């Protein structure tokens, strides 16, 4: 059995870690380096940093904090936001990131996924998918979600895009379930199940974790990793206790 991963997500805006609810009303959560160090020391398996404003504002991610994070932690980390070229990705990887994740830029230029996979290997290339469930239950891919003013439907359905990014060379998919984001009432298991069924690469669930049982429910579907933010930032769930709980439930977890 492959070891399941517990991942903390740090949304970055204007050099600080922030957190919103359903991708809106972001509140300050603290210093990037301090939080990265805290997670590294407290048993998290991996970190994902989303510069939530970079794509929307057409800015580059600051290489300075990426480099500082790399010096201060000893766990893998992934960086996302405004990565539009092989040059952008190369710089972030050179500054210490283990993986890069693309979202809106991949929707604008799907060939970017293939170019990055060829240049750096599929193991480095994560595709983030912001999936919104409408009132009829249709799953739609949104883009530029870092800012309410720019957030919009990309024209693609979630399941179509999941298939497409795999064909293009994505090494991993993070499914951000927008309706669940920050509300702490559990991952959307129905949506996760539908995506997992067509996923041939590692799948990470994001959006909705509120208690330990929510992680267990998601992992029971077969997914590879569960990502959370609010419950970890607010210390509502202790990472080490979560891992012991999951291990006691029979999952393969790194303690």
Swiss-Prot record:
Subcellular location: Cytoplasm
Cystine pairs: none
GO biological process, one term: L-histidine biosynthetic process
GO MF term list: imidazoleglycerol-phosphate synthase activity; lyase activity
Family of the protein in this entry: Belongs to the HisA/HisF family.
Pfam families given in the database record: His_biosynth
Cited SUPFAM superfamilies: Ribulose-phoshate binding barrel (SSF51366)
Keywords per UniProt: Amino-acid biosynthesis, Cytoplasm, Histidine biosynthesis, Lyase
One GO location term (cellular component): cytoplasm
Signal sequence residues: none
Record protein name field: Imidazole glycerol phosphate synthase subunit HisF
Role this protein plays: IGPS catalyzes the conversion of PRFAR and glutamine to IGP, AICAR and glutamate. The HisF subunit catalyzes the cyclization activity that produces IGP and AICAR from PRFAR using the ammonia provided by the HisH subunit.
Domain of life: Bacteria
Active site (catalytic residues): 11, 130
């Amino acid at each position: 059995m492959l070891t399941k991963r517990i991942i903390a997500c740090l949304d970055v805006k204007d050099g600080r870690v922030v957190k919103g609810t359903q991708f809106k009303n972001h509140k300050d959560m603290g210093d990037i380096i301090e939080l990265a160090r805290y997670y590294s020391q407290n048993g998290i398996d991996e970190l994902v940093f989303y510069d939530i404003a970079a794509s929307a504002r057409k800015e580059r991610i600051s290489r300075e904090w990426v480099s500082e994070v790399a010096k201060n932690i000893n766990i893998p980390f992934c960086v996302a936001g405004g990565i539009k070229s092989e040059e952008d990705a190369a710089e972030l990887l050179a500054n210490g990131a283990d993986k890069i994740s693309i979202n809106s830029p991949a929707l604008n230029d799907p060939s970017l996924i293939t170019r990055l996979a060829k240049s750096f290997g599929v193991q480095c290339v994560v595709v983030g998918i912001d999936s919104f469930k409408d009132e009829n239950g249709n799953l739609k891919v949104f883009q530029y979600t870092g800012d309410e003013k720019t957030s919009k439907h990309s024209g693609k359905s979630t399941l179509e895009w999941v298939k497409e990014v795999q064909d293009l060379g994505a090494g991993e998919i993070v499914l951000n379930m927008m309706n669940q984001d920050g509300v702490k009432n559990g991952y959307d298991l129905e949506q996760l199940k539908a995506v997992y069924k067509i996923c041939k690469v590692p799948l990470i669930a994001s959006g909705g974790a509120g208690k330990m049982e929510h992680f267990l429910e998601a992992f029971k579907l077969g997914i590879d990793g569960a990502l959370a933010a609010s419950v970890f930032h607010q210390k509502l769930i202790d990472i080490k206790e979560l891992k012991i709980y999951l291990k006691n439930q029979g999952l393969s977890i790194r303690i």
